[in-house]
């Protein structure tokens, strides 16, 4: 085999290996950030939902809560939306669902944001994450990859950080684990 042929075979293999190495490293970093949030108190935050109500950590104390981060241009967010809708509609009275949309800080066009919210058809409040909110979560070294679902106990401690596309069963299991 000529040197040119060997080089032509070797370079693509190196590039593929580098790609998988980098993506694995990024995934591991994000997973570490998510796990960093578990067993930590929910940061003190204030965000306004689309109906004008201001929500804070204090509104969640005494109830189980689910903070579901999503955005436009997120395929996994679209795929999981029916399961998330079903879960929020079946939620117990002691469970608060809040959807946190990150479009504003990502400079997504407002019409696309409106289209995404209409398509999702969530019945629980949708909060629009602002720079201050995102900075608060960055300071706490949390991940805001989307989709991500944080399940919080009645004392305000995060018990689960569920990364990526979630099934009804996975979220139900997390909620059941923080039943007490």
Regions found by a protein language model. Give the residues of each.
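N-terminal targeting signals for export/organelle localization
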Residues: 1-44, 180
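Short histidine/acidic/glycine/proline-rich micro-motifs that form metal-
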Residues: 16-19, 73-75, 101-106
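Short loop/turn microsegments at loop-to-beta-strand junctions
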Residues: 42-43, 65, 146-147
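Short active-site neighborhood of thiol/selenol oxidoreductases, capturing the structured segment around
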Residues: 55-78
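Hydrophobic beta-strand anchors of alpha/beta hydrolase catalytic cores
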Residues: 66-67, 97, 149
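Structural microenvironment flanking redox-active thiols in thiol-disulfide oxidoreductases
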Residues: 78-120, 131-137
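Thiol/disulfide oxidoreductase modules built on the thioredoxin-like
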Residues: 120-122, 129-177
């Amino acid at each position: 085999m000529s040197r040119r042929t060997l080089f032509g075979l070797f370079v693509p293999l190196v590039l593929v290996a580098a790609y998988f190495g980098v993506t694995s490293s990024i995934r591991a970093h994000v997973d570490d950030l998510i796990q960093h949030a578990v067993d930590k108190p929910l940061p003190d935050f204030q965000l306004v939902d689309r109906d004008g109500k201001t929500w804070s950590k204090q509104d969640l104390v005494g109830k189980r809560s689910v903070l579901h981060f999503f955005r436009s241009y997120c395929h996994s967010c679209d795929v999981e939306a029916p399961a998330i809708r079903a879960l929020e509609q079946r939620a117990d009275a002691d469970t608060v669902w809040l959807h946190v949309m990150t479009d504003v800080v990502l400079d997504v066009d407002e019409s696309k944001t409106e289209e995404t919210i209409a398509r999702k058809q969530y019945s629980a409040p949708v909060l629009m994450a602002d720079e201050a909110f995102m900075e608060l979560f960055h300071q706490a070294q949390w991940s805001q990859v989307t989709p991500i679902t944080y399940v919080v106990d009645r004392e305000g401690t995060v018990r689960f950080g569920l990364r990526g596309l979630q099934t009804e069963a996975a979220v139900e299991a997390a909620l059941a684990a923080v039943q007490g």
